[in-house]
Design a protein with these regions (language model features):
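Phosphate-binding site recognition
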Residues: 1-119
Length: 119
């Protein structure tokens, strides 16, 4: 059973904004941020690319070729070819970025790229 949270409405408004930028969701631990984002993603995207930097440390190497969106997408695809990047239909969800703060630098490149939504 899913419990509706205040962030749910915010995520929907963010998705409707044609000029949306990558989103960083902050909050206390264990309040349901990840669950809310996953629920939102299942309702609004055809493809969800979830990268959890605690559970999947291998993804910390995705910036090895730089912070440009194309390089990061290529490196994620090399690590897991089953991940589908569909322009305009994919949410890339970087979870637990406090464990890999360097990935935040890539957000401006994803903003310029605009093919994928990023949280």
């Amino acid at each position: 059973m899913y419990l509706k949270r205040k962030v749910d409405d915010f995520l929907k408004k963010w998705k409707q904004d044609p000029d949306r930028k990558p989103l960083i969701v902050k909050g206390s631990r264990q309040i349901g941020k990840t669950e809310s984002i996953k629920h939102f993603a299942m309702e609004h995207y055809e493809s969800i690319i979830e990268i959890n930097f605690v559970r999947d440390e291998k993804y910390k190497g995705i910036i090895s070729d730089g912070y440009e969106a194309a390089n990061i997408i290529k490196n994620i695809s090399l690590l897991d070819p089953s991940k589908k990047f569909l322009p305009g239909k994919t949410l890339i969800f970087f979870d637990e970025i406090t464990e890999f703060p360097e990935i935040a630098t890539s957000l401006k490149f994803f903003c310029m790229d605009r093919r994928f939504d990023v949280i």
